[in-house]
Amino acid sequence: MAAEDKFESVLSTRYCKNSPLVSILSETNKATLWRQLWIWLGEAEKELGLKQVTQEAIDEMKSQRDNFDWSFIRAEERKLKHDVMAHNHAFGKICPTAAGIIHLGATSCYVQDNADLIAYRDSIDHILKRFATVIDRLAQFSLNNKEVVTVGRTHYQTASLVTVGKRGVLWAQELLMAFQSLAEFRDKMRFRGIKGATGTQDSFLTLFSGDEEKVEALDELVTKKANFANRFLITGQTYSRQQDSQLVFSLSLLGAAAKKVCTDIRVLQAFGELLEPFEKDQIGSSAMPYKKNPMKSERCCALARKLINAPQEALTILADQGLERTLDDSAGRRMLIPDVLLTAEALLTTLQNIFEGLTVQTDNVKKIVEDEIAFLGLEKAMMMLTEEGVDRQQAHAVIRKTALEAKQLQATQKVDIRQTMADPFFDSVRDRIVGLVNNPINFTGRCVSQTENFIAKELKPTISKYLDQSAAKVQLDV
């Protein structure tokens, strides 16, 4: 059946079809990891003295690890209604010498949970690299525009001047905090290890004739073979699903941060201040050919909503895990976590494309600043007046009255700074303010140095070890 004739997830076929995550989260990789976990278990058991595990059996498993008879596996699972045992039988069929020691002492969650954790870890490693590149691209945009003066906005209304670069590092800070959350999760991530059917390790204690030190060594050795620094000391049949919730929550922070950034970009594109990349042959609307819609930022917002809402499901999976184990988690985890990882990848890929082509509509930005500078100079006037002994509250009241009157006048004509400061109250500071207005950067405070300092002192050091300096620009297929 052709791909177009059946439903497949849009994450893997539309937004992430060229991503390594599609392979990392695939059935083939999962099954390969299960077999690798059986190999590691056999190796560790042999190293610790189990006579029934031979080098011949281990070598046989290694030689057949990637040999899959999927028709046999599917038939076995239909019959047994148990995926791990279906794979166990399939592996044993092609490894007759090892068949008797495959899965020795283990329970299904030994391969299921541990393989999931390896796949999650490898996915996170890729996502962190992508995330670092996204933040780096935004940092470059911010530095390039650190002196481009623009109107700040609070409550979506005109506020004190900022620079485009300073606004950019505000966005970068939100993304960086989400990045740090995910990186911290990755560093603390724990492996399930070998725990047995209910987490007691009784089967392994039996195999090692009651030698607890060897059971502990087995757990530690398999963890090291899987290249994990940390492991759970206590589990039921499964590892705590709270760890899954922490992963999902870390990615939900990415969603929330990205939605804030992309909503801002959409608003600023509507104001005519920014323009997300719009390709030569791109069509904005089938009905309105003149439109340049911020469709990439809109897509990011849609993907972000999926991440923002995901923790609720992860928390219910955690809450419904009964006693040492129930299957309440199984179907949900199979869908939720791969979807969350792929959604994060799709979001970051699109964000990278936006930041690599985001442009400032400088002429319009300058015009908006010129229209508002007559009002925005008044805040600095208030500070100067207080330096001369004027009561701050009195200055605020006069400026408020003057500004509101000028705003009404602005509806029918252009207002300049001399008009807003015509009151004799401003005589002592008027000339100084008028002189400053000729160069609006004078009203942006420490925007330039804040931008430079944040990038140099916090952003770059945080992402440096994850950043691939050779990362290519993103070209979106859709």
Curated annotation (Swiss-Prot):
Binding site for substrate: R14, Y15, K81, H82, D83, T107, S108, Q237, R299, R325, S330, R334
Reactions performed catalytically: N(6)-(1,2-dicarboxyethyl)-AMP = fumarate + AMP; (2S)-2-[5-amino-1-(5-phospho-beta-D-ribosyl)imidazole-4-carboxamido]succinate = 5-amino-1-(5-phospho-beta-D-ribosyl)imidazole-4-carboxamide + fumarate
Catalytic residues in the record: H155, S285
Pathway membership: Purine metabolism; AMP biosynthesis via de novo pathway; AMP from IMP: step 2/2; Purine metabolism; IMP biosynthesis via de novo pathway; 5-amino-1-(5-phospho-D-ribosyl)imidazole-4-carboxamide from 5-amino-1-(5-phospho-D-ribosyl)imidazole-4-carboxylate: step 2/2
E.C. designation(s): 4.3.2.2
UniProt entry keywords in alphabetical sequence: Lyase, Purine biosynthesis
Pfam families for the chain: Lyase_1 (PF00206)
SUPFAM superfamilies: L-aspartase-like
First-level EC class: lyase
GO biological process, one term: 'de novo' AMP biosynthetic process
GO MF: (S)-2-(5-amino-1-(5-phospho-D-ribosyl)imidazole-4-carboxamido) succinate lyase (fumarate-forming) activity; N6-(1,2-dicarboxyethyl)AMP AMP-lyase (fumarate-forming) activity
One GO term describing the cellular component: cytosol
InterPro entries: AdenyloSucc_lyase_C, Fumarate_lyase_CS, Fumarate_lyase_fam, Fumarate_lyase_N, L-Aspartase-like
Region forming the signal peptide: none
Protein family membership: Belongs to the lyase 1 family. Adenylosuccinate lyase subfamily.
Stated role: Catalyzes two non-sequential steps in de novo AMP synthesis: converts (S)-2-(5-amino-1-(5-phospho-D-ribosyl)imidazole-4-carboxamido)succinate (SAICAR) to fumarate plus 5-amino-1-(5-phospho-D-ribosyl)imidazole-4-carboxamide, and thereby also contributes to de novo IMP synthesis, and converts succinyladenosine monophosphate (SAMP) to AMP and fumarate.
Subunit composition and interactions: Homotetramer. Residues from neighboring subunits contribute catalytic and substrate-binding residues to each active site.
The protein, known as: Adenylosuccinate lyase
Organism of derivation: Caenorhabditis briggsae
Gene: adsl-1
